[in-house]
Amino acid sequence: MRQRLLSLDMLRGLSIFGMVFSAIIPSGVLPPWMYHIQNPPPTHNLDMAQAGITWVDMVFPIFIFCMGVAIPLSGRVKIAAGKSAKEYFKELFTRFFMLWGFAYLCVLLNMSSCGGALAQLLTLAGFCALFPLYLQSSKGRTIKWPLRAAGILLCLLLIFIGERLYGFNISLGRRSIIIFLLAFLYLFGGAIWYLTRERLNLRALIFALLLLFTLVTQYLELPATTYANPNIRWWFNMEEFYFLLLLLPATYVGDLLSSSKAPAEAHAEAHAEVPVQAPIQAPAETAAQTKGGKGALRVLLEGALSLIILLFCTWTLYFLYKIYRPDFNAALSRESLISLNLLINCALLPLMGIGTARLWPRFKGVFAIAALFLLWGLLMDPLDNGIKKVPCTISYCFVSFGISALLLIALNFVAQIKANPLQRIFAGAGTNPLMSYVAYYILLLPILKLTGTMTWLQGITASPLAGVARAALLVLISMWIVSLFSQKRIFWRA
């Protein structure tokens, strides 16, 4: 049976939960920290001048981080299995185009917003049509190309029906921007990693050039120029390069974890995808399996360290949210508070690093690079005139990377606890990310509408708080459904 790094699966599952959950919570009535900070309630109009981040602004970077970590984990297994450079790049481009297509299909096949039972049935048919396109067996063999071609024809037929019946606009601009960006990031990140897999100095040079490119293009305000041109923005976005500042360090994390695998794990089967599952095992003997007082003390220490890291990440997010609030008022200036927070971080991070090195030696290097980029990002914050998602700032990429890596370490303890329902749901959904991303919209929601359950749920959860609970429950149900597919070794892979 294949060995896995459950903390990476769980982190990916959490990011998917966050993306879907934040998209379906009640709009305009919740506190500002429940939304993108630049889309505040009640109107949610984009305010590019607003700096700061909330937890919602973190879910996509975490997704990118998981993808970056997984690229070396799967790539090194493929290389060890004898794949040539030609085969690697052929697979890389195939997956890029399949992901690019998925960015359009997951939007164009979703007719659940239309009224009537037929629209819901067509949406469910769209979910089924994605199987011949993206289904992969547990042994990594993709569906034969004739069946994949049939899936393409079925998807095109459903899109044509939707356009005729409901007047859907079919254009190059109608796609999921998240999957669209991930496709390009996977292409660039996968290529850069392969070419620099044994030459970290070259990867560092590419990273430095990307950093310079980001500084220059943002100074010249090129992101706004390219996005304003509809002939360019459907295929090109500056963030395709900016987010590499997050993804490339994540590939180094993947290299660190890959090099720490046990010999038996080096032959793990690779059918990883974007976002990929990671063929890597948690420690063979978990803390919870040890016996005696020493084992119990270790469990207590690991649990305490995991909690401290989670609280530290929470504080960092709260700090970067609070100091940029319009109603922020404190005795010290914002710059003074940022400096004070940096000093506190410089004191706390080494202590947490010592604990990580003692309890989880495998993650020693991961913690070091996480701390480095987190501090670097906080230092860049004032230089960027505040951390921002739009336009994507350097501090946003670096802080997001640091928090993502720390969360991966903290979840290592959670993943070692004896399997529980929530762990199975998040890890199961995390191993099947493409399906998880669309399961609520084109599987669960149409069923709820067909049966009248959605109308009933909306009636009994009219208050904002109840609406949040409803959103969380429905996303968990959709992820649970996907986890059942994963347990049956039914995966969607580009």
Language-model segments: which ranges?
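Alpha-helical transmembrane segments and their immediate juxtamembrane cytosolic regions
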Residues: M1-H267, E285-A494
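Long, intrinsically disordered low-complexity tandem-repeat segments
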Residues: A266-T286
